[in-house]
C-alpha cells in the first residue's frame, strides 16, 4: 500500500473517530439487500433530520471506534456496515432507523453510541420509542401550564370564597 493511501486512510480514521466522539448518537446498521430506491429513501429521511449515513469499511470503523474510546463496538463491525451520525438529536437516528427496519426487514440495526454510551440493539429500540426533543419539551410545557393553571384556579377560588363570606371567611382562613 502506498504512503498516500495510508495517509488517506489514517485521515479517514481520524474523521470517523471525531464523529464518534462529537455525535449525539451514532447508530450502526447492516443495509445489505436494500434496493437503490429503499437506500435513497432511507438517506432522504435521515437527511431531513440532519443525520448523515455513511458506509464505512469495517477496518476503518474498528480503528476509529478504538481511537474514540468505543472499542466495545468492534464486535458489531461484521459484514457491511453503515453508520448514521447525528450531532443534534440523540434519539432521531434510532427512531428513523427502527421505523425503516420495521418496514424493510433487510435493514438490520446492530447497535451504536448514544450520548457517549455504548448502546446495544435493545437500547436502540428503547430510544426509538422516545418522542423527539421537541415532543418532550412540548410535554414539559403542558405540565407547567397545567400546574400554573391549577394554582391560579385555587387562588381564584379562595378569593371568591373570601368575597362571599366577608369577615367570617377571613377569620377561618387566619385560623388555618
Curated annotation (Swiss-Prot):
SUPFAM superfamilies annotated for this entry? Ribosomal protein L10-like (SSF160369)
Q: Which domain of life is it from?
A: Bacteria
- Biological process GO annotation list? translation
**Keywords of this entry:** Ribonucleoprotein, Ribosomal protein, RNA-binding, rRNA-binding
What is one Pfam family matched by this protein?
A: Ribosomal_L10
One term under GO cellular component: ribosome
Please provide, alphabetically and separated by semicolons, the GO molecular function terms listed in this UniProt record. large ribosomal subunit rRNA binding
PANTHER family assigned to the protein according to its UniProt record, in alphabetical order = 39S RIBOSOMAL PROTEIN L10, MITOCHONDRIAL
- Identify its protein family: Belongs to the universal ribosomal protein uL10 family.
Subunit field text: Part of the ribosomal stalk of the 50S ribosomal subunit. The N-terminus interacts with L11 and the large rRNA to form the base of the stalk. The C-terminus forms an elongated spine to which L12 dimers bind in a sequential fashion forming a multimeric L10(L12)X complex.
Q: Name the job this protein performs.
A: Forms part of the ribosomal stalk, playing a central role in the interaction of the ribosome with GTP-bound translation factors.
What name does UniProt use for this protein? Large ribosomal subunit protein uL10
Q: Which organism is it from?
A: Leuconostoc citreum (strain KM20)
